Every structure is written in structure tokens, then in C-alpha cells.
């Protein structure tokens, strides 16, 4: 039986800001956006959350909920440096580390001999080390499988931990809300609820083949999770699956021509990010994303093994066909990256005379 720990830093970006600027402590604080330009909240502290402010919320709406909200720009380089400190702490306990982002990771401590192999005590020690060396708090979940470790890390936040022993897994999952399962978002949860499925116990009692027929591969995964099954191991070399760039516009725009004026800057930035991040990997698709002023969004993609600037503009035209009179508040472009085993050649770009962008 494996011993998996999921470590999740508490309101990470905001916590770093409060550590470095004590005057922010005890006040509602959010990282991202500003009072004069539209944007999206990256994260916020617990004082801000009391007002209903949440990550990925539009800055303007967050300010309506909390007029005294302090907004600060992100300092990504600092967050990356602190994240490296935290990962160095992880490596004292195990080499099996799967970073999910700058502020969370899975650790497999099954073979760790410290604390007589107690995953509970190992998690406590990691959290103590993080606090002592970075001044930041972390929460932890301990379980025999990955998805339950992630669920558990959220149960005693902030600065706490939760342990789900192997013999308690069957009973624990019965009452677990399906919304807690990774991959079950608002829309999927509503579809499941319409079938009378709200907890893992509901899924356990539902015909498996019918779920698979309705939801495909995800239906099969859902059945496994509902029975407390997750055979995924720790992936120590997670590959980046995409590279993209997007911008939240200062004002809503409404026409294709206005969107086309935004595209050159996005494509140029995407070019720079590909050079830094793609490492010669093959692409397999191009994507254009629009978010409207009702906060709904649409994406259009095209399968391709080379980047075409012209195709981005064609995808933009297709996405605009879904506008339905709504204003556009965000525009983004991205490419999907093939797995390393599928890499055949460095990224190729089809150049055009009309658009002088070199990838």
C-alpha cells in the first residue's frame, strides 16, 4: 500500500506578499489586477475570502464584494524562488515528487524510513520545515491514493492536515461529494446531479455501463474514484502540455477588426514563450480563446503539426461567429504540445508575407 502526501501551500502568492510586506497582514489582499485596469485575481488571502473574493474572479467584481481590497501585482520570480526552496525540502524526504504548480505537489513517501515510515509524521515534519525556512504555512493530505490525498489536503486548511488511513477509504468515499473529485466542475456536477448523482455512494449504486455510455472515458474514471480506486503513480517528470498567452482587455471590444488588432502582440509573445519553453517539441494543435462580457468563454482549435499565423486569424474568425452580440473581454492564443515520444523535429512555423512574425 502506497503512502501519498499532497502538500498545498496556503494562499501562496498572497502569503508571500504578507510575509515580505507585513503591513498587508490582517487586511483583505489579492494578487493580480488593478483598480484602473481590468484583470483577474490570481489568489487572495483568507481575509478577502470572507467577503466572497476568489481566485480567477474578475477584479472589478472582487472590488464590488470588497471595496477595501488591496490589489498588488504578482512577483512571479519571487514565487518561483520560494517554490524552489520548498521543493528542496521535499527532496529530503523522497525523490518521488510530482509538482502540480508552484504551490502544490504530490509526494510518495512509501520508502521513506524517517519517523519509522509514518506518513503522518513525515507530513508534519515537512510542514514544520516549510514554516521554519520560508515563513509560510502549508496544508497536507495523507492517503494511500493520489486523488484522496488531494481531497484531504483541503479539509483542514489553513495550516492543517488530514489523514485518510487505508482501512477508512471505503467509508470515506461514500459520503464524498462528486464536486470534490478532480475533473468534476460545475457543468459536469450539474449533469451528474440531474441523474441523481451527488455523492460517490450514488455512483456506486448506478449502472457502470450507463455512466460510461453517457460520459465516455471520464465515466469509467468516475466509477473508479467513487470506489476509492486511483492507480496513478507519481509522475516525476511532468511534461508541459501547452504554451499560451492571453490578455484581459481594458475595455470590451465587439468587432473582428478590433480583435485582429490585438492578435500581433499575442502571437509575438507566444513566439517568445515557445522559444523559452517548447524545447524543440512538436505541436499538435493551435487554439484561440475568447471570453465574453457575460464571463462565458469559447475556444476553437485546429489540429496541426506546425504553427501557422494565418490559422490563428482563421480560428479567431470562427470564434467570433459565436459572439452573439456580446462584448469580448479576454483574447488568448495557444498551442498544444505533443508528447516527447512524438517529437519528430523542432517547431516549424509557416511564415507569411502579410505577417512578419518569426517563431
From Swiss-Prot:
Co-factor note (free text): Binds 2 magnesium ions per subunit.
Organism: Shewanella sp. (strain MR-4)
Active site: 104
One of the protein's GO biological processes: DNA-templated DNA replication
Subcellular compartments: Cytoplasm
Swiss-Prot/TrEMBL cofactor(s): Mg(2+)
EC number, UniProt record: 2.7.7.7
Gene behind the chain: dinB
Family note: Belongs to the DNA polymerase type-Y family.
Residues of the site described as Substrate discrimination: 13
Keywords recorded for this protein, A-Z: Cytoplasm, DNA damage, DNA repair, DNA replication, DNA-binding, DNA-directed DNA polymerase, Magnesium, Metal-binding, Mutator protein, Nucleotidyltransferase, Transferase
Name of this protein: DNA polymerase IV
GO CC, alphabetical: cytosol
Domain UmuC, residue spans: 4-185
